[in-house]
Amino acid sequence: MELSEITRSTLVSTLSRLLRRHKESNPDFFLIRSKMFIGGLSWDTSKKDLTEYLSRFGEVLDCTIKTDPVTGRSRGFGFVLFKDAVSVDKVLETKEHKLDGKLIDPKRAKALQGKEPPKKVFVGGLSPETTEEQIKQYFGGFGEIENIELPMDTKTNERRGFCFVTYTDEEPVQKLLESRFHQIGTGKCEIKAAQPKEVYRQQQQKQQKGGRGGTRGRGRGQGYSNYYDQNYGGYGNNDSYGDQGYGGYDYSGYNYGNYGYNQGYTDYSGQQSTYGKARGGGNHQNNYQPY
């Protein structure tokens, strides 16, 4: 049965209205459909090179190539955000993609199930001399702060060598995580996404499944809003990429090792062992070894 012009027009109008409402109430659903992970990049491929190549499939709104925070070298992968989700389909329909003489590996971005974008960051290597006002001033430049936690040593009643900063939304966290180290006051601090204690325990259980001694040291770090500085050094493990400024994108099924993504950075599991001593005989900086 053929629809009349009036019926067809009404149907199109109704569907457009419903789609618009769905977009307004589920913005992340449409954002993730337009985002891609690009692996296997040449060390020489620049952001401009990648943008120009992918622009043939549609308008590119944003493009990022991740670099080593210490050496500044490309880590061989990046992310791209298209204006329209159909551009992602076009990229995937093409069997091979070659850029700068190397086959690249584009994949559709996948949001982690049940994982909210991080709004809280862990700040390690914080000098005890850095004032709360300096911390507020620096981090306030990235967005609206909801809360700052400055843990105290219960024995000495002095500030610990780390803190937590919570924002009202996730955008400031993503901006902060674009750089691993930040100059705050007189010292260089390390910024990492904070994870709730239950997330940390779930990750630990996965890693220690079938092994012994999985509960050892679990009491460490409790009392700081139930957050741990867990596994922040590992870039090749399950959910790690969601904590590096990409708001919870899941690439756990991807063999990152082929691209050298596991940089072997220090694992700060148990904040007391790394940032724990506030002054400790004046040797605070020696307790912080990120390199």
Curated annotation (Swiss-Prot):
GO cellular component: chromatin; cytoplasm; nucleoplasm
Listed GO biological process terms: regulation of gene expression
Chief place where the protein resides: nucleus
Family matches, as SUPFAM superfamilies: RNA-binding domain, RBD (SSF54928)
InterPro entries named in the record: hnRPDL_RRM1 (IPR034847), Nucleotide-bd_a/b_plait_sf (IPR012677), RBD_domain_sf (IPR035979), RRM_dom (IPR000504)
GO molecular function annotations of the record: DNA binding; poly(A) binding; poly(G) binding; RNA binding
Residue spans of biased composition, Gly residues class: 210-222
Descriptive protein name: Heterogeneous nuclear ribonucleoprotein D-like-B
